[in-house]
Design a protein with these regions (language model features):
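Short amphipathic alpha-helical segment within the helicase RecA-like ATPase core
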Residues: 1-257
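A generic structural signal for tightly packed, nonpolar segments enriched in small/aliphatic residues
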Residues: 50, 192-491
C-alpha cells in the first residue's frame, strides 16, 4: 500500500505540481499576492471563483508562482468550516488533479476555526481517501496519477507528525474499503482469514479457528449461520500486545463479517442483494483499525475477534424455529435467519471476554432500521457504561467517524424473550429494532464495559453522499475511530 509523503515548508519554496488555496463563501478571493492575486480577482469579478463546499477552480500559472497550477478549493461558509469541510475540499482537489498527481502544496489558514494540526490531518485524509477508486476490477483502467506528496505552507514542524500519522491511518481506511468492495466469490470467510494472516508480523499475531474448532468451543450460533455454505465460517483473531502498553486495559474489538448475506431461509429480496457483499464492513474495520494501531505502535493491548460466515440457503441451513446454544450457554430461538449478525457477534464477544478483553466494542452493519433513523453519515452507539460510551463518542467526534448515542433499557429486554428458549434472535415488534438488537447483544457481552456500533448507514453506501472522500460501496467507517480510541486509551 502506497503512502503520501509529508513535508512542511515556507510559502514559495519548491516547485509543486499544484498548490491549493482554500476559499470560504465569505471571501471573494483566497489569500495570494503579485500577478496571481490580480488574476484571481479577475476570475472573482467574472463569477468563476466559488467558495461553495467542494467547488474547485483550476488555474495554470504560466510561471507566475512556484507551482504550475493553482486550485482554489471551496470550504463553504466560514462559520460552518469543520474537519469534514476540509476533508471534502481536499478530496475535491485530489479528484480534480487526478490526471496530474505528483506534489500538492496546501496553504494552512490560521483564521479558520480549526488548528493547523486539525487542518493538516483533514487535508491528508481527504486527499488520500478522495483518490481511492473502487473500480479495480475494470479491465479498462483510467489513466491517472496519485498525489505522492503534500507540502504544507504556514505550519510548524509539529504538523508534519500529525499529517504523517493521518496518511498511515487513511491508507488502512482504503484497505478496509477494498475488502468491503471485494466480490463475494473473491472474499469468502477462508479468504478473509488469509487476508488477515498477511498482516501478521513482529508486533501483530493473527490466527483463525476453522469450523471444527468453532464447533469444539461450542459456538453454536456462529456455526449455525455458516453451515449452509460450502465456504465454512471462520473466527479470526488478531492480538496486538506491545510490551510498552500502559495499564491493564485490553481493548476487545469484535467485528461482524458476513462476506455474503442472502438472508438464509428468511431470504432477502433480490433487489440490491448484490450489495450484501458489504455485510462484512464491520469486520474489515476492526482488522484494518488493529493493523493501523500496530503500525503506529500505540502502547495499548488490543484483542480483535472477527466472526466471518456466509449466510446462504441449502439443505444444511438453520431454520426459523431452531433453538441454538451459544458459547456462553444461553439458548436462542431463531425467528428470523436474516437476523444473523447478532448471532455471530454473540459467540465472538464471548470469545473476546474469554481471552481477556476488559473493554469491548463491537462494530457491525446490523439493522436496516438504523440506516432509516440516521441515514448514511452517522452510526448508532449503544453502551452499558456511561464512561465507555463517552470515550467512544469523543473518539468518533475527533476522528470524523460520527456516532450518535441510543438508549439501552432493561424494559426493552422483554421483546426478545422466547417462550421456548432464553431469548429469540428477532422480535415481531417492528419499532425500535436497533435497540432490541442491542439488548440481545447485551446478553452475550459479559462483565465489564461494552459498546455496540451499528454502522448500517455509513459502512457501505448505495450512492455517493457528495463529500468526495466517500463514494458508492465501502467507506472504511470505523478505522479512524478505532485508532483515535486506542490513542486515548494509550494516553
Amino acid at each position: 500500500m502506497e503512502e503520501v509523503e509529508i513535508e512542511v515548508s515556507a510559502p514559495g519554496d519548491g516547485h509543486p505540481d499544484a498548490v491549493a488555496l482554500p476559499l470560504t463563501e465569505d471571501e471573494s478571493t483566497p489569500r495570494s499576492d503579485g500577478d496571481l492575486a490580480a488574476q484571481l480577482q479577475q476570475l472573482a469579478d467574472d463569477g468563476e471563483l466559488k467558495g461553495e463546499l467542494g467547488k474547485t477552480t483550476l488555474l495554470h500559472t504560466d510561471g507566475e508562482t512556484n507551482a504550475r497550477r493553482v486550485v482554489v478549493a471551496g470550504l463553504g461558509k466560514r462559520a460552518d468550516v469543520d474537519a469534514d469541510a476540509v476533508r471534502t475540499a481536499a478530496s475535491a482537489v485530489a479528484r480534480r488533479l487526478g490526471d496530474v498527481g505528483g506534489t500538492l502544496g496546501w496553504t494552512l489558514d490560521e483564521s479558520l476555526p480549526l488548528s493547523a494540526d486539525e487542518q493538516a490531518r483533514a487535508v491528508v485524509e481527504g486527499a488520500v481517501l478522495g483518490s481511492y477508486s473502487p473500480a479495480r476490477w475494470k479491465t479498462q483502467q483510467k489513466s491517472g496519477k496519485r498525489i505522492a506528496k503534500i507540502v504544507f505552507y504556514g505550519a510548524s514542524n509539529g504538523v508534519e507528525q500529525t499529517a504523517a500519522r493521518a496518511t498511515h491511518v487513511a491508507k488502512w481506511v482504503n484497505w478496509a474499503r477494498d475488502l468491503a468492495n471485494s466480490p463475494p466469490n473473491e472474499l469468502t470467510p477462508e479468504i478473509l482469514a488469509a487476508r488477515a494472516a498477511e498482516l501478521a508480523g513482529e508486533r501483530l499475531e493473527v490466527s483463525a479457528l476453522d469450523p471444527a474448532q468453532i464447533d469444539e468451543l461450542g459456538m453454536g450460533a456462529l456455526s449455525a449461520v455458516g453451515r449452509a455454505s460450502a465456504n465454512g465460517p471462520r473466527l479470526i483473531v488478531l492480538r496486538y500486545e506491545p510490551a510498552e502498553a500502559k495499564g491493564d486495559v485490553v481493548l476487545g474489538l469484535v467485528g461482524k463479517a458476513i462476506t455474503f448475506d442472502a438472508g438464509g431461509i428468511s431470504l432477502k429480496p433480490a433487489l440490491k442483494m448484490y450489495d450484501m457483499k458489504g455485510d462484512m464492513a464491520g469486520g474489515a474495520a476492526v482488522i484494518a483499525g488493529t493493523a493501523a494501531v500496530a503500525e503506529l505502535q500505540l502502547p495499548v493491548h488490543i484483542l480483535t475477534v472477527v466472526a466471518a460466515a456466509e449466510n446462504l440457503v441449502s439443505g444444511e441451513s438453520f431454520r426459523p424455529g431452531d433453538i441454538l446454544r451459544a458459547a456462553n450457554g444461553k439458548t436462542i430461538e431463531i425467528t428470523n435467519t436474516d437476523a444473523e449478525g447478532r448471532l455471530v457477534l454473540a459467540d465472538a464477544m464471548w470469545y473476546a471476554r474469554r481471552e481477556g478483553a476488559t473493554h469491548l466494542l463491537d462494530v457491525a452493519t446490523l439493522t436496516g432500521a438504523m440506516e432509516v433513523a440516521l441515514g448514511d453519515l452517522y452510526a448508532g452507539l449503544f453502551a452499558n457504561d456511561d464512561a465507555w460510551r463517552d470515550d467512544i463518542l469523543a473518539a468518533a467526534q475527533e476522528s470524523g467517524d460520527h456516532t450518535w448515542p441510543f438508549p439501552l433499557h432493561r424494559r426493552y429486554r422483554r421483546y426478545v424473550d422466547s417462550a421456548y428458549a432464553d431469548l429469540k434472535n428477532s422480535s415481531e415488534l417492528r419499532q425500535g429494532s436497533p435497540v432490541l438488537a442491542a439488548e440481545f447483544l447485551r446478553e452475550f457481552a459479559g462483565d465489564g464495559p461494552w459498546a455496540h456500533i451499528d454502522m448500517a448507514g455509513p459502512g457501505f453506501l448505495e450512492r455517493s453522499r457528495g463529500d468526495y472522500y466517500t463514494q458508492r460501496g465501502g467507506t472504511g467507517y470505523g478505522v479512524r475511530l478505532i485508532v483515535e480510541l486506542a490513542q486515548r486509551l494509550a494516553a
